Every structure is written in C-alpha cells, then in structure tokens.
Amino acid sequence: VLDRSFVTQPQLPECNDDGNDENKPFLVKPDALLVNLKALRFVTRNDSGRVLVSVEPPIASIRIDNQVKVSNAKQCTGDVRYNPVTAADGSVTVTVSGQLAEGCSSQTYLSLLDHATYTAGAVRAIWQELGGTIQGRDIQAPVPKDAKVLARAFSPDLAEIIRDINKYSNNTMAQQLFLSLGAQFRNDADGDDAKAAQRVVRQWLAKKGITSPHLVMENGSGLSRAERVSAREMAEMLQAAWRSPYAAEYISSLPIAGTDGTMRKRLKTTAMRGEAHVKTGTLNTVRAIAGFSRDNNGNTWAVVAILNDTKPWGASSVLDQVLLDLYRQPKLAAAAPVL
C-alpha cells in the first residue's frame, strides 16, 4: 500500500530549464513517498573484455538493452550513451550504446519512473535482495487503520537536510522541505501545502520585522520562473539568520568558496578560498550568489548579487569579482595600545 496523502500537492507550471531532457534527476518533483530522490544509477564497465551494465536499485520495470562494444582504445573516452524508451505498460527499456575500453567504466543518473512505481519497485527489489518476497499488487491508498507498524525510520535533522540542499543546490529537497513546512501548518483556507508554506514564511518574516513586497514564492526552490526576491530583501533575511541562535548551523550549510559544494571550483586559487560561505543560483538567464563573506580586516558581510541576462556568459566571474573586491578592503591601521 503506497500512501501519498501526507502532502497536498499544488498545481504548478513546469520549469523547463533542462534542454528538453525530462529525465534529468534535478527535475524530480517532491512527493510524500520520495525515495532516494527517485534516481536510478546506471553503471557500465568493461571487465576483462566483457561489457556489463547494471542499474541501482534493480527495479523490475527497468530493462537494459546492452549494445556497448569493446574498444581497443588505450584511454577511457566516456563514449557511452543511455537512451530510455517507455512502453505502454509503463516499463522502461534503456538502450546503452557506445564503446568502452578495457578497465574503463561509465555511469549516469536518470529519473525514469513515477514516484509510486519507483518506490514500490525499490522496496520490492531491496526486500528480494534480503531474501524476502512480497505477494500481491501495488495499490495507492491511505494506510489501513488496522495496519501494524513493523519498522519505523526517521529523517536526518533539519541542520543536516539544509546542508545537502544548500551545498549541492538540490531543488528536489528544497521543494520537499517547503511542502513539508506547509503540511505541518496547513489550515483549511490554504488549499494546498505550497500556499500553506508561503503563508508560514511570510508570517515568520513579519515576526522578524522584514518587509518583503518584492518576494514571490512558488515552489520553494530555485527551479522556478515565477519566484522573485530583491537583493535587499535577501540581505535582510541573511542578517536575521546571522542573529539567530541557529546561525552556526545555517552558515555551515552554505558552500565554502574554493572548497566544497557548488563553490568548490570557484575562487580556488585566490585569497578568497575559505573566506566565504555562499549559496549559488543558476538558471538559463540568471546567475546569483547569497551568503556571508569576510573582508581583509576580518569583518563578515551579508552579500547578495543577482544578474539577469538573456546571455549570462561570464556572469559567474563577475559575481566572483564582487566577493574579491569586498575582500580587498583597505587594511585598517592597528589601534594604539591602551595603557
């Protein structure tokens, strides 16, 4: 029994920022039964001249057509392609083609099934690997009132969850958190959990004394063409976070310049490495940064910069320069010792 009733889903427009590749994992939508981010990991390897293709988890409705040829190349070229085709019965055949040299491997992540099919298939596959069997068919319905709890699992705490969201810009998890917030505080007037979350966030902002007339929330993530916020409003939110008793947990969730997350390769060879905790934002026509950055004198600044352009080539370098210029504040003269 697959119970997806915890979340009341909103009806939102698609954000097609994917180059028309609907199978990219970062486009996975939130769901009450979200399991493993609905991702399938395909691994192809050349093992002593024999090409093997596997999928994790090994869901029965995913079939593999292995057409990869053995290559005599001396280097691993990564010339492997994965082409999924969905059949009328909902099963998916993934044709894997290309060439792979001895000792080489290739992998990719795809999202190919709906939430219910993926969850049921993953549970059945894992249970079978453990030596068990599940009889009967899968149905979507509320959990029967007379059902007995056999096992219970708890999510990581919020500090750990937002670390994954912010470090790696995980839109699916951000939307899931947004809807979970709505589900927790939903009332009859909200209609769906996105509207409930929007109301709760605005109430929190008002409580903190933050006015946000330009703020538009849709799904709670960066994967939206409707969401809006001004740089000043975002900076005020960061200042509120700085004053929070949970400031340390929040700041540590942000990517560190030149060190990890989406900032791992940026500012790596500059004096800014390790001096900023900054969340990045990227859409086809938008580049942004927001977070906390230190200057040459050890002062910490709330920093927000948003660039909108139809051709944002080089925009990330411009944003990096903002952080560098802020860091290069003139050195303050040392204060005279007090006797």
Regions flagged by a language model, labelled:
Residues V1-S212, N296, R328-K331, A335-L339:
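Conserved serine DD-peptidase/penicillin-binding transpeptidase domain
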Residues Y168, F178-L339:
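Small-residue-rich helix-loop
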